[in-house]
């Protein structure tokens, strides 16, 4: 009977575990310098991060060159045919074999380079963090402690979530600090009936045209439209939570003329200030009756 292979870097290892992780340091003509060839793939997933040199992944006549920072995801049943690129002196890659938790499904839906082989490349700022997480997973996965495997799985979950977070940031980049400061300035000056864009632009050291462009680019609406939304929101809050006279509410949000305030409020909400307040009071009374 053949002796079981205990080295996960060599052919024949069973990978009969929830998580196995390691580093494969392939040097030209070294003992690990051969192509992995699993035409039927594996039962679990494998994540592969290139950290040095170059590797090449082959799949039915197509090839992909792995460079430092590239992360590949091989799902169950996907062809595994990869090794050191023939023109590279080395290919060092960290890897994690795992069987996922059921709720990870969405996090494992990666864009593919071909067939079902997933690909993700963090931007330069995030690459050290992903490499560090891989290292922590490997250390925990190779540990002998009672909770080592659970810790490794927890770190892997963090890595998958970090990828989701990085993708979300790329789709929704953080707000420009100048736009954020402009929003704060506008919110602090809602009662200013002499408001103009120039004063906001001066506060954040931009020209009015540049501020208007950035505002629309980041928030999708104009400065004046955003301010009006804030004024109406604040007016609704004051009408629903205080007994402040309607004229005073209007002045608190920059309307000196009560009739004009009422017109604008009704246009935005479909109800006059007095109707809106009455509706809020009715809802409060209904809740009080139900609780009594």
Swiss-Prot record:
Result of changing residue 258 to A: Defective in DNA binding
Function comment: Transcription factor that regulates the expression of several genes involved in the transport and metabolism of L-arabinose. Functions both as a positive and a negative regulator. In the presence of arabinose, activates the expression of the araBAD, araE, araFGH and araJ promoters. In the absence of arabinose, negatively regulates the araBAD operon. Represses its own transcription. Acts by binding directly to DNA.
Cellular component terms per the entry's GO annotation: cytosol; protein-DNA complex
Primary localization: cytoplasm
GO function terms (MF aspect): DNA-binding transcription repressor activity; identical protein binding; transcription cis-regulatory region binding
Compartments, record wording: Cytoplasm
Descriptive protein name: Arabinose operon regulatory protein
Keywords of this entry: Activator, Arabinose catabolism, Carbohydrate metabolism, Cytoplasm, DNA-binding, Repressor, Transcription, Transcription regulation
Residue stretches spanning the membrane: none
Ranges annotated as DNA-binding: 198-219, 246-269
GO biological process, one term: arabinose catabolic process
Activity control, per UniProt: Arabinose converts the repressor form of AraC to the activator form to regulate the araBAD promoter. In the absence of arabinose, AraC binds to the araO2 and araI1 half-sites in the promoter region of the araBAD operon, leading to the formation of a DNA loop that blocks access of RNA polymerase to the promoter. In the presence of arabinose and the cyclic AMP receptor protein (CRP), it binds to the adjacent half-sites araI1 and araI2, leading to the binding of RNA polymerase to the promoter region and transcription of the araBAD operon.
Pfam families referenced in this protein's UniProt entry, alphabetically: AraC_binding (PF02311), HTH_18 (PF12833)
Lineage: Bacteria, Pseudomonadati, Pseudomonadota, Gammaproteobacteria, Enterobacterales
Effect of residue 31 to V: Eliminates the self-association, but does not affect regulation properties of the protein
Tagged with keyword Repressor: yes
Domain of life: Bacteria
Residues that bind alpha-L-arabinopyanose: 8, 24, 38, 82, 93
Keyword Transferase annotated: no
SMART domains per record: HTH_ARAC
Oligomeric and partner information: Homodimer.
SUPFAM superfamilies for the chain: Homeodomain-like (SSF46689), Regulatory protein AraC (SSF51215)
Annotated ranges, domain HTH araC/xylS-type: 180-279
Induction context: Negatively autoregulated. Autoregulation is either greatly reduced or nonexistent immediately after the addition of L-arabinose. Transcription is stimulated by CRP in the presence of cAMP.
Domain-level remarks: Contains an N-terminal domain that binds arabinose and mediates dimerization, an inter-domain linker region, and a C-terminal domain that binds DNA. Arabinose is bound within a beta barrel and is completely buried by the N-terminal arm of the protein. The DNA-binding domain contains seven helices arranged in two semi-independent subdomains, each containing one helix-turn-helix DNA binding motif, joined by a 19 residue central helix.
